Amino acid sequence: MEKKTIIDLFESSAKRFPSNPFLWEKTGKRFEPTTYSEVRDLVYEEGAGLISLGVRKGDNMALLSEGRNAWIIGELAMFYAGATNVPLSIKLEEANDLLFRLVHADVKYIMVSGQQLKKIRAIKEKLPAVRTIIVLDERAEYQDREMPLSEIRRMGKVYLGIHP
């Protein structure tokens, strides 16, 4: 039996069921669907944006977020860029526990939700190997080494325009 990766399985499903809902997320009082095709477009944009940012095959990236569409899309984008995801539980409250995992895994990039950002900010000065912290939620301002996910997507669109 041929071994299939998560990317293989996702691509197969996106080709077979492009208009079918893949993800559901509550916005206001209703759950809204996102189709396989829409998710694939977002994953391609984010993955290309990560490559444009400098993510290379084998780089370790961390993902610290509550369960949500951006988490799934972000993880798939990491895989498309060739990175390895170092998943982190939002239940990690002790700075030393989080710091240990990030340093031990030699994480170079972090994707983090707005709710979890304070945990990363509290330790980021002890993370010199981390090049960029990608914030999943828009904020009024960003600190050193932080950038919004929207910028990654913008970079991805430019990259895909040059490298279709």
Language-model segments: what does each one mean?
Residues 92-123:
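Conserved ATP-dependent adenylate/AMP-binding module captured primarily in the ANL superfamily
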Residues 61, 85-86:
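A short hydrophobic/small-residue beta-strand
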Residues 75-81, 104:
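Short hydrophobic alpha-helices that are characteristic scaffold elements of the AMP-binding
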Residues 115-164:
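ANL superfamily adenylate-forming
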Residues 10-34, 137-143:
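AMP-dependent adenylate-forming
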Residues 1-24, 41-42, 60:
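AMP-binding/adenylate-forming domain of the ANL superfamily
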